[in-house]
Amino acid sequence: IRNSTKKNEIHEALQKKGCSIDNLDLVEVDLLKDQGWDQAFEGVSHVLHMAATYTSKPVSTDEYMRPQLEGAQRILELSDKHNVKQLILTSSFVAVYNTTTSKTTFNEDDWSDLSTPGIADYDKSKTMAEKLCWDYIKKHNPSFSFTSLNPAGVVGPTMSNHLDVSNDFILQIVQGKVPMAPKFHLGYVHVEDVALAHVNAIDNPKVSGERIILFESDLWFQQVGQILFEEGFKKAPTKEMANWIVRMIGLFDKSLKLLIPYLGKERKCNSQKAQELLGMYTKTSKQAFIESAKSVS
């Protein structure tokens, strides 16, 4: 973990879910520093590299890039050094769908184009970090097997009082702080299916050397609002916001500004590989939004 003060929060969250923590060891490490990593890797046979910087608050490009790129490089080298059997990277669908073309349906062969106008720093960093990993595998041919999992928008109930970016946004929706729905389209997957996909990938020979998108279904933001409205969250937006309004408000609101390059653009996916190799999906995106809303309200 990156902050030892969160140990109790992690323990409590797991215990509430009925999980035993008897065999759980938490070691504080920093993606940008060497200390502590060799200790953390002692006796480790499988690595799930899930850590990434993501925030709705303004941060510099460097604050996104360095942890992603240096962190990925560090994990690769440590996995090699400590004879790890398997490394699973949590990448993202954002490393897939950014394009300068009119393409709307994507698969694992697609890569985000870093020259896409308006591409977010987070999207760039995830794309570059994943490419770094695949390049390392090709160049060094390490003994460990490598798999990249690329989830779409991850949504679902929170396990603690700490709200991540997704759940904080859901809270704003149910509180009526988002009065209208921007014409924004994205794929989603339930957080529990993302966790299950990682577990199902461990020691699974079918996923070695594979890039797998986790994408249960796609929704327009207005559809998300309608789902929550019908579930009793009457402050959720059901009317669509005109693109010109989003652009105008985006001059002052940085979270809306990030949506501008994607207004009106569909981003769909053929997620057959996840179904065939990992047994996805057990929950719908609709369930994910409803459970998230109930957990934060």
Task: Name what the model sees in each region.
Residues 118-121, 156-162, 179-192:
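Glycine-rich "substrate-gating" loop/helix at the edge of Rossmann-like oxidoreductase active sites
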Residues 140-144, 156-168, 201-212:
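Glycine/proline-rich active-site loop of Rossmann-fold NAD(P)-dependent oxidoreductases
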Residues 170-179, 184-212, 217:
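Alpha-helical substrate-binding/gating segment
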